[in-house]
Amino acid sequence: GDYTKGKRHTIDGLQAPFGVAVDAQNRVWVSSSYNNKLTVFPGDAPDKAKTIEVNLGGRGVAVDSTGHVWIAQQSNSPQGALPPGAKMPPNIPANAPQPKTIMEEFEAGAEYLLTNPNITQTGMVGLISPDMKVVQQDIAKGTAYIPWGVSVDGNDNVWVGNLYGQSLTHICGVKPANCPAGKTTGDVIHNYQSGVIQMTTDVIVDDAGNLWSANNWFDGEVVINPTYQGRTSTFGGGQGFVVTYGVAGPVQNPLMGPVRRPR
């Protein structure tokens, strides 16, 4: 195509759009950071958008080989419920207006982290059927802590960059035969943590089954603390990419539409 002839579209349902995926029917699936809608529209007819109610604060979106869609959600309900025992920062009122910029959003998120030092989970992963029905909404509940990026591997299992959880979460997909014995769709297979996995955002699988993940932050407190942190003052930004060798089912790249195994 000719990129100079592109057009900006206003799509009903979008509010701070974040993740994008395209399925085999050429439908575009888009999450929104600032509402509880997953928006779906034909690639050749963006004016015919439909929405699905999900939990407030959508992030990464991925399509598996069967057309099911997986979405990272940063809260515990469509209304943005917090986990038991969690509280909002004192300077953020109830029903606060949405942040105006991504940095304001990060600041609010970091304040939530500091206000709740004993909380270890917030958010979960959702599974949507090809006919746009919610199949499961609370996947990885208890493990997910601000889940961010989502990728599907060649076994149709799911990988999530678990930002505040500082981990890579491996989830059994829609083909339990490809999962360890006793695991079924939506079960956490393993939650990978190590000294090199920091505050992770996006994650992707290559043709050899290696998992690549982005360390976005290193030390969350250093990122937002207004006072000098001494010897840790340079620990703000994350330290590059992490490759976890051979843990995922190989994927045919480049990824165009639903995930595919290498030929």
Question: What spans do the regions from the language model cover?
Answer:
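Flexible "stalk/tail and boundary" regions
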Residues: G1-R263
